[in-house]
């Protein structure tokens, strides 16, 4: 979609609790796409690097500031209850989306929900007869049982903790295996870029780090990114290592380990600023899933002069910028709550 924005095919975009300026590959191209939009709105509960580029920021609420249901990867549907009121003008995401539809007047009757419970009732109807069938789950039943597994096609059905235990969803009940043909990565190594760069996560941080980079204990545990390299590359622990790809370069302290391949380097991606890993990654897309090829691109390494800085999380105008870990240091102070988290900002 951001590529379509860059070409002018998409004119306006609303993002909900996402931060592509940190989490998506080839950050420079992502920035060009957002800058090409005629209108850009972000909905989030903390300001992010992507919010900083938006025309309008609408304050969303945290999960504990509303009630609803959540489905995890194993198919278990659980209910969460409201623990606190959202501050200021912050509102749940569903309310904001419905209100935008109402004010635009475009199929507003399709968004005439007054609670998250009403939205769940719509899901029960829409999923009836499908593989992920929620129709037998009631609001009260989910809460009283602590969770129900889909499919659950009737209110007296126990749910399905183990999917396909008796038969698979084919006429003969048997599984289907689909062998795939191996494809090389979109960007192969060569004489100029002889190594492979892969990116990933750390235990202390989550996704783009927009929440975890504000929590002192987590910043103290993992204050900044590094580059993991094999001893054969000739670096010592803590050396500044410059990683270069066809899109950009950044310099990190070396973490020298024997558990990584000799032809591969690894960088965690949760940070913004000059040390953002996704400055360097390739934005080639899988032809079927359209998922970017995050995990492999060609690179080279050389000894750097200084370690690049990370950027602290954005805060609203007027809020003190003393988020723990700002500027690359860590301390044990509690994170500063952005003032007026519920204030819409242009």
Describe the predicted segments one by one.
Residues 2-5, 9-29, 42, 46:
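Glycine-rich anion-binding loop/nest that anchors nucleotide
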Residues 117-217, 329:
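Long, low-complexity segments enriched in small/aliphatic residues
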Residues 20-25, 30, 47-51, 65-68, ...:
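Flexible loop/turn segments at secondary-structure boundaries
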Residues 32-36:
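Short, conserved loop/helix-junction motifs that constitute active-site signature segments
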Residues 87-89, 93-145, 215-228, 235-346:
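Long, contiguous, secondary-structure-rich segments that constitute the structural scaffold
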Residues 2-10, 18-19, 195-204, 217-247:
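C-terminal substrate/ligand-recognition segments
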Residues 45-81:
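Flexible glycine/proline-rich, aromatic-decorated loop/lid segments
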């Amino acid at each position: 979609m951001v590529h379509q924005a860059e070409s002018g095919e998409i004119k306006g975009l609303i993002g909900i609790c996402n931060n592509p300026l940190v989490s998506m590959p080839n950050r420079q191209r992502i920035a060009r796409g957002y800058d090409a939009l005629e209108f850009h709105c972000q909905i989030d509960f903390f300001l992010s690097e992507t919010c900083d580029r938006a025309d309008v920021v609408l304050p969303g609420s945290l999960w504990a500031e509303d009630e609803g249901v959540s489905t995890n990867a194993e198919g278990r549907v659980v209910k969460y209850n409201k623990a606190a009121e959202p501050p200021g003008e912050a509102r749940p995401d569903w309310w904001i989306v419905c209100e935008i539809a109402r004010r635009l007047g475009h199929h507003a009757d399709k968004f005439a929900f007054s609670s998250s419970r009403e939205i769940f009732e719509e899901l029960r109807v829409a999923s009836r007869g499908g593989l992920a069938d929620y129709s037998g789950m009631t609001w009260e039943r989910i809460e009283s049982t602590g969770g129900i597994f889909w499919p659950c096609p009737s209110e007296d059905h126990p749910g399905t903790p183990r999917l396909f235990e008796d038969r698979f969803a084919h006429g003969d009940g048997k599984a289907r295996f689909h062998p795939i043909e191996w494809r090389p990565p979109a960007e192969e190594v060569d004489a100029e870029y002889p190594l492979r760069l892969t990116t990933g996560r750390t235990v202390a941080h989550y996704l783009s780090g927009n929440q975890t980079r504000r929590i002192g204990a987590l910043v103290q545990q993992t204050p900044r990114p590094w580059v993991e390299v094999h001893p054969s590359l000739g670096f010592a622990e803590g050396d500044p290592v410059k990683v270069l790809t066809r899109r950009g370069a950044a310099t990190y302290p070396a973490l020298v380990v024997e558990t990584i391949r000799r032809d591969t380097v690894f960088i965690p991606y949760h940070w913004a600023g000059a040390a953002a890993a996704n400055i360097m990654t390739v934005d080639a897309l899988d032809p079927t899933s359209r998922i970017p090829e995050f995990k492999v691109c060609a690179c080279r390494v050389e000894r750097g002069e200084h370690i690049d800085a990370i950027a602290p999380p954005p805060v609203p105008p007027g809020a003190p910028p003393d988020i723990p870990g700002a500027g690359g240091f860590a301390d044990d102070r509690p994170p500063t709550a952005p003032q007026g988290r519920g204030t819409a900002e242009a």
